[in-house]
Amino acid sequence: MDYSSTINLPKTAFPMKAGLKEKEPKIIKKWEEEKLYQQLRELRKGAPKCILHDGPPYANGDIHIGTSLNKIIKDIIVRYKSAKGFDSPYVPGWDCHGMPIELKVQESLGDKYKETSKFIMRKKCRAYAQKYIDIQRKEFKRLGVMGDWENPYLTMSPEYESEIVEVFAQLVEKGYIYKGLRTIHWCMDCETALAAAEIEYDDNHTSTSVYVRFPVLNKINDKLDGNVDVMIWTTTPWTLPSNMACAFNRDLEYVAVEIDGRYAIMTTSLVDTVLSKKDMKAEGRDMIPVSMEDIEKLEIAHPFIKDRKSAVVFADYVEATAGTGIVHTAPGHGMEDYQTGMNYGLEIYCPVDKAGRYTSDFPEMQGMKVRDANPKVVEILENNGSLYHKEKVTHSYPICWRCKNPLIFRATSQWFMNMTHDDIDKRTVKALDNIKWYPTWGHDRMQKMLENRPDWCLSRQRSWGVPIPAFYCKNCGKTLLTAESTRHFAEIVKTKGMDVWFELEAKDLLPEGTKCECGSTDFDKEQDILDVWFDSGVSSFAAQKTNKDLDGVFPVDIYLEGGDQYRGWFQAAIWPSMAIRGIPPYKELVTHGWTLDEQGRAMHKSAGNVVSPLEVIDKYGADILRLWCISEDFTHNARVGDNMMKAIADNYRKIRNTFRYLLGNISDFDFTKEKIEVKDLLPVDRYALSRLHSFIKVAEKACDGYEFHLFYQRLINYCVVELSATYFDIIKDRLYCDRKDSVSRRSAQTVLVEILDVLVKLIAPVLPFTTDEVWGYYKGENASSVHLELYPKADDNLIDLELEKEWTSILKVRDDVLLSLERARDNSTIGKSLEAYVTICTKEPATKELLTKYEKYLNEIFIVSKVTLSDSKDDTFIEGGVSFVKTEKASHEKCVRCWGHYDSVGTDSEHKELCTRCAEAVR
């Protein structure tokens, strides 16, 4: 008789092949048609809020792998928080203003750019930004990111721009905003000032360094009267025309060293270094100490500008680590130089225009770019005998974040936010202690960046952005910037848009009757715009006003961005918040690392190692990319490449096959009617249920701490080792061969349903497409989405640690049995494990007691036909970790249905080819 039809084989239409590339777009369409995001908002209405505030990506170009990592991790967190019962809306945003877009539009205009008005330029920039907002929105949705995509916050929307101006008004009102002449970082190519957040560093920049003699005009002391120079060292020869002083340090010792018939003053500790540049030594050389009193009365001439003297100043930043211990000081071309110049009343001299060319103030080199000027300056020094030595040095040098070209320091009049007003610097550093940092080192990193930070340069000399709403009296030149005038403009922007600044006259943008102190009502408008970091920095204010789901939520719970944002958005956001609200805008600050190629190299188009997320999705599916995002600790740099994706896809298949096994083996089971009570479950089923709820705790702890890589590792181990290789293996015979409605079979199915229900919910935040598909097969096509479900709760009553401890010991014995079976296969004693009888001699009495307790289940646990426990062993036993095991060929007949070799085979008169269990199952 053929008994194959009596086997309870798994039945499910859930396919083994994922086909994510084809399925995922259909699932997205289904979510949109069902308004899943809106359903979730309605379902969580009134629940505690948990807001992850989106740091706005720049609306320029397609998304890259780093952007994908950022958005996916955010989405996993938001989905997880929603599953935990929080009302966790996700409002995406875009950073729309700024130089990259303006330069792209400028490039597209070509020669017409110079003839294009600011109004037209802004219109084109707006269209360009909107184009990429639409492109990126589609790409983010394809990643499976769920959010309010139809109502994002855009820094170029009238509502948002109005709030930027309103926040600026509050800062004006509180006394934080001022305009002043400062030496700041300047990009000659972009022709604009830059703030600290926009500066990068080239660690391998090569500069021309020069040692220069500045002639001393007066008698210093009885030994030094004529033929004396002050020796300075600089890596920016082009700034020498702007020299106004030589800076000394009162804590250093100075000496005049005879070199080629003249004396050169320098710090004593650097004499050997300076002389070595010319292969000279100090030994036998005349050296005369120079006192502070001598230094204070020095009269120093500029080395090549006639009738200009270089003042003597003192500064703590002058060190004896390099150079000569005397610093060339040009207040118009250095931050420290500027401060020293202010302290000593020096002229803030800067003969360089916005394009980096010398002006008519230095006619000898008028029109020359300063980046090309070093050879000319060196030539002048050589010709007049002032050059002691020149050489190339490699060092770290500031470059523009946008064009990557070297920056200069340039003294210009700019708008600033005062970073010491009302002790905001001290209050902000102290407030860092109230923030949770992931990883924890973020606190110290941020603190170092905030301490002694210079005032925030807010003005930019561009057109695509939010104008600084200041006015200038045409009659007396005084500046008009008040909270009242700024708020008035904010209201105009709210209804008419920001472009009115470029369309209307100043009088139409000011409150009626506005007058200057001189009585004039005639004003000019400021031409500069606000730093775009200010735009995104005030998003915690502005996004609230543009989306009802965020209204009234402050501070938000989470900011999550890459590590570069410590000097960018994280800082830009904290300063306005501390100034206006007195607290940081975020409770938790989470940082992710960079994405690198498989060899750990940075990705560059020129290197041909760029990994496109869209190509990954097209090949593997978004769920595979999402699984990669949690496969490693995202707070560290993450490597990505095709080999890694193949490995991730392999693990995904293991997860998918776990779901397929679960669905297939509960197809004939009605949980509500046929479930077995916990107290009646078979021991291995109770153990599996306990392990499931222990897993929930592990998963929850990992996800609460954003350690998704730990969840991933535990998930793969759970699916592959605990379920597939162990529990599923043990219960397979019972599921397939026990009577369909037997308690033993229903016991296993009861636990399988529990595992499926928990597992699909645990994984849902990470694999939204796959779990949605699984949920449909589990609950039926018309069931509501799994993403509306709550996260599983671990039931402590179902966690039996003593039982888990027992089974840990049993499974160690199982490992020993599997080893013995493998040896028996190798020597052809057996084929399949059911052909084996095993005898076990444990190393510890307690282990035997445990096996005796579960003796009736050992055949099932070890998947053999007979198990005998013995107190003795011989050399036919194989030694394992906790026991000795002997494997023998089964001596009884094989049951043709279950393939076990039992002494009961042939005892049933009706079914002589079956064992007793199988005969009962087929009646």
UniProtKB/Swiss-Prot annotation:
Pfam families: Anticodon_1, tRNA-synt_1, zf-FPG_IleRS
Compartments, as annotated in UniProt: Cytoplasm
Intervals of motif 'KMSKS' region: 602-606
Listed EC numbers: 6.1.1.5
Enzyme class at the top of the EC tree: ligase
Span of the signal peptide: none
Organism: Brachyspira hyodysenteriae (strain ATCC 49526 / WA1)
Cofactor binding note: Binds 1 zinc ion per subunit.
Gene: ileS
Lineage, top ranks: Bacteria, Pseudomonadati, Spirochaetota, Spirochaetia, Brachyspirales
Family: Belongs to the class-I aminoacyl-tRNA synthetase family. IleS type 1 subfamily.
Positions annotated to bind L-isoleucyl-5'-AMP: 561
Protein name, as recorded: Isoleucine--tRNA ligase
UniProt keyword list: Aminoacyl-tRNA synthetase, ATP-binding, Cytoplasm, Ligase, Metal-binding, Nucleotide-binding, Protein biosynthesis, Zinc
